[in-house]
């Protein structure tokens, strides 16, 4: 739902402005969260979760707002800092959610989400001004414009770089639980603690990107990030295949994938949205 909604959230933000769209999606998120809190059936809960996912598509506007405010190089730096902060939540949310669920029941995490959503809505309403002058083009026309973006060779380079970096990360997310529990034999709780390492690596990479992208350039930072990630994958593969598999052989080297992706993805995102700033 989030992926599909992102195809439309950008054109809508271009047509009506960033602020109105964010206010609308934040309100939808709060209403959807209330639906989850007071759900009396699994169907009602699923509808609420889908609506949460739809409203969460507005997360893409954070990068667009940064691009509205800063030039190409500075935008890469700022996106690095923003994604560093965003990496904190996936690191600790499973632990916090499990803790709240055990103490107060399954509705408790949704209450916390409602509190966060309320704070976000207040921040947008009281602090965020409009950063983009809305266009007269219709949403359908803006979507057609996006197809013209696909004819730009440069944007495909950024897309491919982002796709491959993300693919390596999601391959790790899908395979690490099986390898950790079934091959190495660690407990799920221990595995969860090791997962934090890659998240911390991603934060480190985001910090490096935010600190140095403007100085050395987007493309150079993406290359360095790819090299760091490849070193981590190669080292983990060597250790796991040539020695008795251990949990450290899996996660310690793969934390470099987090570092590399933290260096690569903010710059790929900034580069992609800079190819056609008019869109």
Which residues does each predicted region cover?
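Conserved MFS/SLC helix-loop-helix module at the cytosolic interface between two early adjacent transmembrane helices
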Residues: 3-42
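C-terminal ends and interior cores of transmembrane alpha-helices
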Residues: 27-40, 228-244
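Cytoplasmic helix-loop-helix junction between adjacent transmembrane helices
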Residues: 42, 48-85
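Residue-level signature of mid-helix packing/kink "hotspots" within the transmembrane helices
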Residues: 2-7, 57, 90-91, 199-203, ...
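Paired small-residue
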Residues: 28-35, 43-51, 248-256
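Helix-loop-helix hairpin linking two adjacent transmembrane segments in secondary transporters
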Residues: 44, 80-126
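Juxtamembrane intracellular "pre-TM" segments in multi-pass secondary transporters
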Residues: 129-159
